[in-house]
A protein has these predicted regions:
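Charged, low-complexity intrinsically disordered terminal segments
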Residues: 2-450
Length: 450
């Protein structure tokens, strides 16, 4: 066999020639096979490397996707935890199918020892109106009230005859269980209430709103919602004195599920705040207002076309689209053309009764109505032991505006309660309302101070 060796230059070796020469001579394996084997090894290595790169890239994608999913889950959890008050079922009542043809009845409580002229206007007694509202109930009665003192057993015996209406109403509420009617109560009373305890034993659900922790204030709302169809709203709380010795005013509205549903949403907000010591960051859609000052409900009241909406306070208790009490009061005053009549407990436009900082929001609007628009203003204010002395200064300041002004009219009267033999007061003017030639504001605003 002929041996052929291929040498390279003297300075080095040709690796290919060297391999070929010895492979041919030592093993007899074809050179092409060796080259193919090496190429296959190179290809396998490159394929493995490419697959490894793809695998690492896929793993990175999975990690990124997993991280995004985790972030989304945490975000959803935070949102759902922030929406802490969800509202309740609305029995299928919507803005589209609710009733707007409503009947309204004024109810009031006049203390027994107060007499009026024979030709004076009288309205349905408050106690009779509330009894009638309970007679309409078929499924659920929802009550928001700051106080629960319907039974006067803790007071002096001289009050017992006057408190019979309160005891009768408490008995009617206890009887709802036998009729299969659910009673739900939201109260601002943080301490123990024997009456609420009794009602709880009669199957009532009672929720407390800790307003001190939430706003450092008090719950003042007082209203009933019956079957999401009828409701009461006014100045009276669930206190036997509101049915006997105080001057109260409110309205009963029947077959008005549009407004009742909106008021039910206000109740739902209070109901969901039990045990809460913080204001939720987000409100559920079920708590959003259906109507407000810019888009009021167009309805019929006693066959008369009208507009209506509910307002609320404070601002932190306002879900989307809900108007504030201050906005509602301002709108009523600003839209008055001829007269403004106001009945309220206290008129004290101060930010604080101790710091004596002037609060001009409402007082300024009344002054504008008097001077700029020549609107006639009448004020009926309670005068009792808790009346702040500066109240008289502010009223005198308003009256002084009209001393040298033509067509400027302001009248102010103080409603004085009578002192009983035991030192208690009877006949306190507890009304809170405002009526003009164009609108009515009826609410539970305690006094016009901040």
């Amino acid at each position: 066999m002929e041996l052929r060796g291929i040498r390279g230059p003297m300075g080095g070796q040709d690796l290919k020639g060297q391999g070929l020469g010895f492979s041919i001579t030592g093993s007899g394996i074809p050179a092409s096979s060796i080259i193919t084997a090496v190429q296959q090894q190179d290809y396998s290595a490159s394929v493995w490397l490419r697959r490894r790169d793809k695998l690492e890239h896929s793993q990175q994608k999975c990690i990124v996707i997993f991280a995004l999913v985790c972030c989304f889950a945490v975000l959803v959890a935070l949102i759902f935890s922030a929406v802490d008050v969800w509202g309740e079922d609305e029995d299928g009542i919507t803005e589209e199918n609710c009733s707007k043809n409503c009947r309204v009845v004024l109810v009031e409580n006049i203390p027994e020892d107060i007499s009026f002229l024979d030709n004076s206007t009288s309205h349905l007694p408050l106690s009779a109106g509330l009894y009638n509202l309970l007679d309409q109930a078929m499924r659920v009665v929802e009550i928001a009230s700051p106080l629960w003192f319907l039974n006067s057993s803790d007071y002096e015996s001289s009050f017992q005859p006057a408190a019979r209406q309160g005891r009768a109403l408490l008995s009617r509420l206890q009887g709802l269980k036998a009729k299969g009617i659910q009673l739900k109560i939201s109260s601002g009373l943080s301490g123990n209430s024997s009456e609420l305890g009794i009602l709880a034993k009669h199957n009532a659900e009672v929720h407390y709103v800790n307003m001190t922790a939430l706003t450092k204030g008090h719950l003042l709302s007082s209203f009933w919602v019956v079957d999401r169809r009828h409701f009461y709203i006014g100045s009276a709380s669930m206190d036997w004195r509101s049915l006997a010795t105080r001057k109260e005013l409110g309205v009963l509205v029947y077959n008005c599920s549009c407004l009742a549903l909106d008021l039910h949403r206000v109740f739902g907000l209070y109901w969901g705040l039990q045990y809460k010591d913080f204001i939720p960051s987000f409100w559920s859609k079920r708590l959003f207002a259906l109507f407000n000052r810019d888009t009021p409900l167009e309805l019929t009241l006693n066959n008369t076309k009208a507009q209506a909406y509910f307002s609320s306070s404070p601002d932190v208790f306002l879900p989307r689209d809900r108007s504030s009490d201050l906005e509602a009061i301002s709108r009523v005053i600003q839209e008055a053309h001829h007269f403004i009549y106001i009945s309220i407990i206290d008129y004290l436009p101060l930010l604080s009764s101790t710091a004596h900082r002037y609060w001009s929001r409402i007082d300024g609007l009344i002054r504008e109505a008097l001077i700029l628009r020549k609107v006639r203003v009448r004020l009926l204010i309670s005068c009792w032991e808790k009346t702040h002395p500066l109240t008289f200064n502010f009223i005198w300041s308003l009256r002084s505006l009209c001393m040298e002004q033509a067509n400027c009219s302001l009248e102010a009267k103080f409603f004085n309660p009578r002192v009983q033999r035991d030192g208690s007061l009877q006949g306190i003017n507890h009304n809170r309302f405002m009526v003009t030639d164009r609108a009515i504001y009826l609410g539970e605003l305690n006094d016009w101070t901040l």
